[in-house]
Amino acid sequence: MRIRKRFLIKEIKKIDKDVDSNLLMGKPLSDYLAKLRNILANYKKLVNIRSKIQTKTDPNELKEELEVRRKQIMEDAQEYLRLLNQKRIFENAREYLTDLNTFKQILHYQKVDRIKKAKDNVNWANLLEVFNIWIVDIPNVDRILPMEPELFDLVVVDESSQVNLAQIIPVFYRAKRICVVGDHKQLSLESTGLGFEISNKLDSYTWEKYKPANLKYEEAKEKRITLTKASILDFLRENNFGIPEVMLDEHFRSVPSLARFTNREFYENKLSIMTEKPEYELYKSFKHIETGGRRYGSSKVVIEEVEKVFEIIRSLLSSRSYQDVQLPDYVPEEFTVGIVCFTREQSEYIRIRLFEEGIGERVYVGTPEELQGHEFDVVIISMALDKASNRSKNHYENKNRFNVATSRAKYFTFLVYGGLPENFDLTKRYIAHFSEEKPNVVLEEDNLHFSRFNFESELEEFVYERCLLPLKESFKREYGVEIEIYNQYKTCGYRLDFVLYNKNNKKFVALEVDGPHHFEGDGLHSYADWHVERIEKLKRAGWNIINTPYYKWYLEGWLDQDHPTVKGELERIRKELEHYLL
């Protein structure tokens, strides 16, 4: 037996030199065989991988194949998890059918005593085995779920700026961990008046009656723990609990020109605008209309604005256009319209008119407080404002309210107002943001633009002259398409070396010229981590990217056009451009 062991150890060490012979001698023979099988299997895999790598003379080709494989792995993994989840649900549903039927009764019962009795009869551990992710609005949490500690591994609270402490503490009781999501630069609980609709006097009276922690009401307000004055987001942000905070800095909702205003005005340009693409920058996204008219008496309704709002709606719904505005093709056929009113009276007046005229479908109306958290394809902001309303500045130009009102639209915003008071500086900046742009197109002069002065390296200029210009001419000659080339295009917080845009079909692709600093200094032409992260972020925003590395164009000097490496790279880029642009 020992001779056989020594023989096996000797064979193992031929493959794995780090094996400890003395350690193996003391183990059963089965351990040798298992070890040998594992080593041989791994060795065969490595040999297979090495042979595949050796057949790839071009690292860029290998990178592309790895990208395809990785994408396929992600798709397979997602499908596997989906099927695994379905399998778990079906298997557990059969086993816990009684609990499912009882829970179904909870959803239909109206009487509190019947709901409580049904909840007591549910084995919640079984039910959570069937459904492990729940989406519930806060008022229904107590109605549906039992008051059991740590019922969920994680509870996520969205729109937390509108959730008060009394509402959320029972929810947190059911959680092992919590995640609070909200925007402190949008409307807070105090502004919206949501939650428990009680007066400040009742809030103060109740607090002083019970006086938790012996705190006076005014002290409690300062600590942001009163019912009507503070949300869970306010409470966590304004008390130093050492809870980590992460900013979600990628904006996916609005087209670039709309997003740039809110980014600059309210977020100090800290957001990456993930919608910055040529197709969204070739069209108008904003129109302001001064209707004249005024409020009458104590009314906060401007009739002239209301009539203009309905004129716009009828025209959009019938022809997808209004005056010089034509909704682009990327706006959905069944587009939604949100009417944002700065006064409740104007909102209610328009709501009644919508009902009377039967225009309710796909059209929604509300104040910024009511529409926070919602988005619409097209937004009409009706300000109910005249030139004499200068005393209303604090309401209209409250930054949080203005942020919500101006960030509901995905594709287009109409701003309708009777008149603009002299002291409305924020509103004037809002209008000026768009009037700086050209009349017929929405573009930044330095974005949809090409200039040789923008080249940041000789390599960029070389690739433009030897590759992009000839291909542009070739595409026009062979396919009859006009390809626009932009350089140093700003998107997602980065600048792209080149963007190629097919004006015929609105398709586009980025071409990145990767110099030596884009690679690790290992001699293997491996991309640096920061560059990989950059590419991943751009792809997350929907960009198709062609990378061309410096060593395809330069090798101790610029390579000639007839050099095999250059010819191969030109052919590769041409094929990718045909794929993405035609």
Residue ranges and their predicted role:
Residues 495-533, 550-555:
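Short beta-strand-loop-alpha-helix junction that forms the active-site gateway
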Residues 112-266:
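ASCE P-loop NTPase helicase motor core
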